[in-house]
Amino acid sequence: MDAENWKTTLTFANGSTYVIPTLGTSIDNLILSSTVNPSGCNPLSASVVVKLPVLGRIKLIVHSKPGKHTPDVEYTFKDVGLKQNIPVLGLYPNYNNQITLIYTDLQGNERARSNLKLQTKTLESRRLPKEIRVVKAQYDRMEPGMNLVNSPGQDETDTSIPYMIDADGEIRWILDWEKSDEHRYIGIGCGLIRMQNGHYMTGDGNHHRMVEVDMMGSTIHNWDMLERGYTMHHAISQDKQGNILATVSKTSAKIANGKDVRINDFIIMMDPEKGEILQEWDLVHMLDSARYGMTDYDLTSDPFAQSASNWAHNNGIVEWGDDYLATARYQGIFKFNKAGGIEWIISPHGYWRDKYLKLLLNPLHADGTPITDPEVIAGTKNCDDFEWPWGCHTAVPLPNGHILYFNNGYGRNFKLDFTDRKNIYTCGIE
């Protein structure tokens, strides 16, 4: 019996042999290879290949550093094949990581285990923070897992380096797009969303693609949106059917003069497997495209100002029940149905044409009583407990039926006065 190699060799009288699987003592000799950063984009990942004598599963443990609050990363894989490629995630940078592989039978009973070390390098990206210091941590209130940060670099056109930190503030996962010839120009504009299949998807606003990658950093899909007649803008999400929703511009769309190109006023639904466009919503047929130029006319060339082309500036889209919740920097927060019918709009009432007024929600004080001041309703001033969304972004429906959104503060009260420091602030609002 050869316990180390999980086999017993029977030798017959005629000299022939027959090998039968036998319970071994460890799985050291079942590990064929281990490779750190197999995709080239995730230096805190590894691939371990094992060859098992009989069907079974592998349970992985990535051990936390001694004295840390973050629990070990543990996962039992579903694969029961004889040869398995085990993805290892959650390694520490510049550290000789301790990994445990546990070989179980189909019922989950442990057969044997093995420990191995995986040495990682120092993270090199200049776009990562030089230091992460935990100021306050309430470990008993933290959800399991790690926190995803969409690191933008110094400019919106810089390569985005998304990473995850654990409860101790250590980086444990990263997508270093700069190491990829294919993706090194992906910016922060669309962030990074977790898909239902466990992969991640982002939109490349610099080269107008939609990219799906797995947790290791390997490319699954790379959809060219220009070939489909669109350029990427600011937001992507996934609906309950698995389709991708995205805010885009349509390259063939023109304003009323038939010459100037419209931008940032389309939403599309795309099949993430086939890359087919399943539906398109044109905001010109949903919102008031004549509602622009409300800010200081002396600042119409400013990038924060509106124009006939950039009248909406769509920047958020998510599914909400059977409908959709969207944001446009200059037009507010709105809910619409699959047919494109507007259910309601949260926006200052100023400058809307008459046919849209019935769609505008009325403002309330914090105690639920109606606000009656016409200037507050119009949006030309705030009151102590209410202000409209100004340059709103990324509205998210909450379990309690409320909406959480980011208020950028662009053009607050229809003014773009960047010298008025009291009027320039951003905030999250529920």
Predicted segments with their positions:
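A eukaryote-biased signal for short, well-structured alpha-helical docking elements
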Residues: 6-17
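Solvent-exposed serine/threonine-rich low-complexity stretches and specific carbohydrate-binding patches
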Residues: 70-80
